[in-house]
A protein has these predicted regions:
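Helix N-cap/capping motif at the beta->alpha junctions
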Residues: 31-40, 61-63
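Charged docking surfaces used in two-component/phosphorelay signaling
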Residues: 16-24
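Conserved phosphotransfer cores of two-component systems
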Residues: 43-45, 69-76, 98
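Alpha4 helix (beta4-alpha4-beta5 surface) of REC/receiver domains from two-component response regulators
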Residues: 63, 86-103, 111, 115, ...
């Protein structure tokens, strides 16, 4: 898999922080602030790692992941949830388990995040 990451988060500070971290690691970064923009980029051919926030307006991360699956856009991506919501919604996570690589809570440990993304990018 290419060293590409799409960060889907409505918090501009998170988008900037993650961009700085992963550009130093040699990744190509795409940042979008909504689920619909994520789907748009996937339809345009994005392939790589997706770090998906859950709590976003209009279309939350769960709905975005469901829409990605429904449209058949998950073939060339690995999705990881990156959220401030400390405890996962186990019922929703169970339904998406085969399509979600990891559940990472904010604030995140930078070294662990870089390591996890490295594993996902190697898939």
């Amino acid at each position: 898999m290419d060293k590409k990451i799409m960060v889907v988060d409505d918090d501009p500070d998170i988008l900037i922080t993650i961009r700085k971290i992963f550009e130093k690691e040699g990744y190509e970064l795409f940042t979008v602030d909504s689920g619909m923009d994520c789907i748009y980029e996937l339809e345009r051919g994005f392939k790589g790692v997706i770090l998906m926030d859950i709590m976003m307006p209009f279309m939350d991360g769960w709905d975005t992941i469901n829409e990605i699956m429904k449209r058949g856009l998950s073939k060339d991506v690995v999705i990881s949830i990156l959220t401030a919501k400390g405890t996962p919604d186990h019922e929703k996570l169970r339904g998406l388990q085969s399509n979600v690589y990891d559940y990472i809570t904010k604030p995140f440990d930078i070294k662990s995040l870089v390591k996890n993304v490295g594993h996902m990018a190697a898939m």
